[in-house]
Amino acid sequence: MIEGLVTLQKVMLADGKEMTTQRAIELGWITPGSRQKPRGWGLERHEVVVGKNLFTDNGRQLLAFAFGERSPISNFTCRKFGLGTGTLPPKVTDVSLESPISFYLGGQTKPINTVDFSTPFVAKVEFTIAAAEANGFLITEMGLFSGNDTLIARRVHVGINKTSDFSPVLGWRIRF
């Protein structure tokens, strides 16, 4: 079974300075999903676990297409992320976020920063919510999307109380 784990990697303040993840929790900006860090995910000491995710049926199908190098490959690999305020538990049949938040120009997905493979059997997707994005929302759901906007994985969690004061950098690990 494919598993996923979302973590808060760091918090950047609006002035460009980095704040500790612990301080962001103390301010009520981030609510951790778990205080306990699972093993085998390649987590760094300062990372805060937001919670696990559910890999969708469409995500599993995209993985099969990518394995076979179906063209264009960008349609079948993780390229974007989305945010929302939905609270319904994820299901493998989900095809979208329950209640998406729009980014710039009304788009509901945004390009990820990077994907790295520094831990065996784990792909880590990193993405940033800019200081100017999703302000005034309690972000309770996230999704990873392919290049053609197919929902790969979805996570519903306690929340990120987003303001223009900070820009969270998140890591979403998928273990194979």
Regions found by a protein language model. Give the residues of each.
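Small cysteine-rich, disulfide-bonded extracellular modules of the LU/uPAR three-finger superfamily
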Residues: 1-139, 147-176
